[in-house]
């Protein structure tokens, strides 16, 4: 796995024990590490990456929850082959509690589904954003890692959610349209005084070398016009078997763990595990709810 991080690092069992907190039903001040996945356009494979990396982190012994914030076009539940009874819609409407919308999937990670085909969720007002902030804090108190699947594009709720994460994973691919739209999101993030580190994953690439070259193009533009350095997380080559898969099949890391795509996904999960460890050893002063409320006031 090519990365700007130390390629020789691997999680030791002792370090993993440091990552794990007290049991989920115990009180603890330290909250989950928040990693938000964004993209400039749909179709980059953002949800595919989010769900498979959640499984990869779970396989490493971490307690993981996926929060599908792609409201109205949510599909994380499909990729995790889950049929949740309730979604974030029910929570934001005050109909259900966080416990009722939280679902345990068959593959390990927990899930809060986003709700699909619901236009009222496409643009949340300040009140509902505040409710979302409180929900994220409740989840962050129970898990080690919180993965947020944000809607593609520049919608305010997506930008706010990206800005409250400890790390942003920007998902793109070698297509010009995907790179152009990814840069638009990055440029918008660059205008904010307080912003997370931005990691880039080049998905659906013919080779890892093409993935690296694609990143360098995006990084060069970002440095020149947005004065924002980007970090290369890695590339995910598209194995020939991927394009023939159906939604009814198990996630890639479970169904085909030895294929080239899964090998790349596993490597990325290892890097996210490292991010989680580093954040847990140097926690910030504000919880995720406070960070989001501050962004809502600024936006």
Regions found by a protein language model. Give the residues of each.
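G-domain G4 guanine-recognition motif of GTPases
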Residues: 40, 173-174, 198-213, 235-242, ...
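P-loop/Walker-type NTP enzyme "switch/lid" segment
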Residues: 69-141, 244-251
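NTP-binding/hydrolysis catalytic cores, primarily Walker-type P-loop NTPases
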Residues: 252-299
